[in-house]
Design a protein with these regions (language model features):
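Stable alpha-helical structural segments in soluble proteins, enriched in small hydrophobic residues
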Residues: 46-50, 85, 103, 201-210, ...
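Acyltransferase
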Residues: 193-238
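N-terminal beta-alpha supersecondary unit
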Residues: 1-64
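DPxDG-like acidic metal-binding loop motif
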Residues: 61-90, 95
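Surface "functional belts" at beta-alpha junctions
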Residues: 22, 89-199, 230-231
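Residues at secondary-structure transition points
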Residues: 30-38, 69, 73, 77, ...
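Phosphate-handling active-site elements
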Residues: 50-55, 83-93, 109-112, 216
């Protein structure tokens, strides 16, 4: 199965072409322009490098959140357009799951002893995150928007942490520095390893897509924000 994978949930958008779980090519944009300006040219470059046309694809996989509200909307709209035009199905992928899957073997600690925290910076000491066993990706804290200090408190109460089954915590993603500071503020004695730049999102999206996720019609792609936007919060507060 050949898939175009896309991520616009982070500050840097990315895209790649994968076949049967193997990378053909991918690209991460470091341009300072907005996703609305960079994403589709990025897709065109990746597909040209892979020598792939839309009719050659079996489906499209895209991160649907949480993350950048505007970025998520841009990615979903673009993928919907491509899928509807080519008559292909789509796979919706969680941004935090893709982050977790993209960082396999990021440390020397055995995966069965590691708790992974994929975290996306949501500003104002907040992160979009979840906590999961690194080897199985079994969630121990659900994907949600968390205050970083509150999240540290919740992590320290996870039974697998209390009883030492998971002796290292791996924090990945743009929220890693926020979480590092929160652990320091809490004077936590847990073994923390932060890897903000370890994620290769196209790889994570592809691994999530090839993990047996359901293919859906493009029209059914929906964002998973996990929080209201700042504009909505301001409107609600008058």
């Amino acid at each position: 199965m050949k898939i175009l994978v896309c991520d616009t949930s982070n500050s840097n958008c990315s895209a790649g072409v994968f076949e049967d779980g193997k990378e053909i090519c991918y690209e991460l944009s470091f341009e300072t322009l907005t996703h609305s300006e960079t994403f589709m040219p990025l897709v065109h470059r990746v597909m040209a490098k892979a020598n792939v046309k839309h009719e050659d694809l079996d489906c499209y996989a895209v991160t649907v959140g949480p993350g950048s509200f505007t970025g998520i909307r841009i990615g979903i709209a673009a993928v919907k357009g491509m899928a509807l035009a080519s008559g292909k199905k789509c796979i919706a992928v969680s941004s935090t799951e893709a982050l977790a899957r993209s960082c396999e073997n990021a440390t020397m600690t055995p995966r069965e002893e590691t708790l992974i925290i994929p975290a996306i910076d949501a500003r104002n000491n907040r992160v979009f995150a979840q906590a999961a066993e690194e080897d199985t990706l079994k969630p121990l804290l659900p994907e949600n928007a968390y205050d970083a200090d509150d999240l540290v408190s919740k992590i320290e109460k996870i039974p697998e942490i209390i009883y030492g089954k998971r002796r290292q915590i791996l924090v990945v993603g743009s929220g890693a520095s926020v979480m590092k500071k929160a652990f320091e503020n809490a004077k936590s004695k847990l073994n923390i390893y932060c890897a903000p730049g370890a994620a290769i999102m196209p790889k994570g999206v592809a691994l999530s897509a090839f993990a047996g996720k359901e293919m859906i019609d493009a029209i059914d792609l929906k964002a998973s924000y996990c929080a209201v936007s700042q504009a909505e919060r301001l409107k609600k507060n008058g």
